[in-house]
Amino acid sequence: MSAPVLTTSSGSPIDNNLNSMTAGVNGPILIQDFTLIDKLAHFDRERIPERVVHAKGAGAHGYFEVPSSDVPKWCKAKFLNKVGKRTPIFTRFSTVGGEKGSSDSERDPRGFAVKFYTEEGNFDMVGNNTPVFFIRDPSKFPDFIHTQKRNPQTNCKDPNMFWDFLGQTPESTHQVSILFSDRGTPKSYRHMHGFSSHTLKFVNAQGKPYWVKLHFTSETGIQNYTAEEAAKMSMNDPDSATRDLFETIAKGGEPAWKVSIQLMEFEDALKYRFNPFDVTKIWSHKDYPLIQIGRMVLNRNPENYFAEVEQAAFSPSHMVPGIEPSPDKMLQGRLFSYPDTHRHRLGVNYQQIPVNCPFAVKGGVKNYQRDGFMAVNGNGGKGPNYQPNSFGGPEPHPEFAQHKFDVSGFAARQPYNHPNDDFVQPGDLYRLMSEDAKSRFVSNLVGHMSGVTIKEIQVRAVSNFYKADKDLGARLCKGLGIDVNDVIKFAARSNL
């Protein structure tokens, strides 16, 4: 069988791809050599901006299946309305702070994003492998991420800036406790759970709203590396999780997760013992047990990493009728920030890229958005580009209006007002650990905090853990050579 003809980007056949066109055997290259210029010019532009967070990742295709007829009681989204109904999905797993060439085994939260291609549009669940987050107000997010990256002078990771910020952000104690536990270094993307972390709103066909949190429970089970195992894997195979996911599916394996919700009655949000929209806290499973609403299965690898994984764009603002945002401040900030960074990284028409395209919408996407870089979907054809119009263009339908709810209070920059402090849940987490797990947790924290060269930063950071659990604080003091009385004094006067 003969090989296909090699062409330029414009489709012209190429006679020789290994030698440039020159003036004589030893002469200079001719500018008319379009084959060479076409090749070099495209190569010069192969890299697009790296994601500012979640740069290193892996992805796979699959499906979401509904196992129960109960789901429509709580949510009118059509992809949830029938037992056995399957919705195509694309997932992307990632580390958070590292660059694109960083190790899959680094101690870091893991991104857990799922794009549901539904008949009513794409629904993006953009979560992590942890049920909470470091901060609860998006105003802090750029500062937080800066501290997880590189020092602006040395261009090296800096424990001083890392712990300086976290020590002065006590709400981070819960997430930091998870990060430095065994779950901070998952063995693979298959061996971890996923969470929406944020509270979302479900609305049923009768207009009744509920608050929910989404949980993705790995059917493979959780498996983690110790710090020593993770460091060794980083040296031996920094792409271990990416490789594991691809090879598992290539061999016929189908990684799967049980998808569940915690369901809170709408009115309960006002009565719960802490603000249920605070993403630094979990809802007790005793108060709100898991209810299964689906099963997620991955069964197909990408054909091309760049086209499908690197160009994949997930946004919490991509919702469908029946699923709406909550007042969670971090979620509210992400509703803007995520599509905004996609427009920067991929262009204003990023949702025309096949992996992002809402292809399951019957009749296709219809709106009055036009032009911009890389408009490749017909650009609305000869139809009108304004609304209202008299030429049969698409029109809004009032029945798709979101659920109405009351808001009150003063417009001001203000923190959450809730009675629960930021140390109860991390303290509970520590006390639930086995003695071996506690020892590894303390060792992981001591190992990282040992890089801090400013004592006050160490003392402040340790004081947060001391407030969560005195035994934990004392063990950290011992490991770091800090006088526990200094920590006690700091904790007593700290009013952060």
Swiss-Prot record:
Give a yes or no for keyword Oxidoreductase in this entry: yes
SUPFAM superfamilies from the UniProt entry: Heme-dependent catalase-like (SSF56634)
What's the protein name? Catalase-A
Q: Which InterPro entries match?
A: Catalase (IPR018028), Catalase_3 (IPR040333), Catalase_AS (IPR024708), Catalase_clade1/3 (IPR024711), Catalase_core (IPR011614), Catalase_haem_BS (IPR002226), Catalase_immune_responsive (IPR010582), Catalase_sf (IPR020835)
Q: Where in the cell is it found?
A: Peroxisome matrix
**One GO term (biological process):** response to curcumin
Give the record's keywords alphabetically.
Heme, Hydrogen peroxide, Iron, Metal-binding, Oxidoreductase, Peroxidase, Peroxisome
Query: Where does the source fall among the domains of life?
Result: Eukaryota
Q: Which organism is it from?
A: Dictyostelium discoideum
Q: Provide a Gene Ontology MF annotation, just one.
A: heme binding
Q: What does this protein do?
A: Catalyzes the degradation of hydrogen peroxide (H(2)O(2)) generated by peroxisomal oxidases to water and oxygen, thereby protecting cells from the toxic effects of hydrogen peroxide.
Q: Which GO terms describe its cellular component?
A: cytoplasm; mitochondrion; peroxisomal matrix; peroxisome; phagocytic vesicle
> According to its UniProt record, which cofactors does this protein need?
heme
Residues of the active site are H54, N128
Enzyme class per UniProt:
oxidoreductase
The Swiss-Prot or TrEMBL record describes its family as follows: Belongs to the catalase family.
Q: Which reaction does it catalyse?
A: 2 H2O2 = O2 + 2 H2O
Q: Where is this motif: Microbody targeting signal?
A: 494-496
Q: Which residues bind heme?
A: Y338
Q: What happens when the gene is disrupted?
A: Cells are resistant to methanol, acriflavine and thiabendazole.
EC numbers listed for it are 1.11.1.6
Species lineage, top-down?
Eukaryota, Amoebozoa, Evosea, Eumycetozoa, Dictyostelia
Q: What is its main location?
A: other
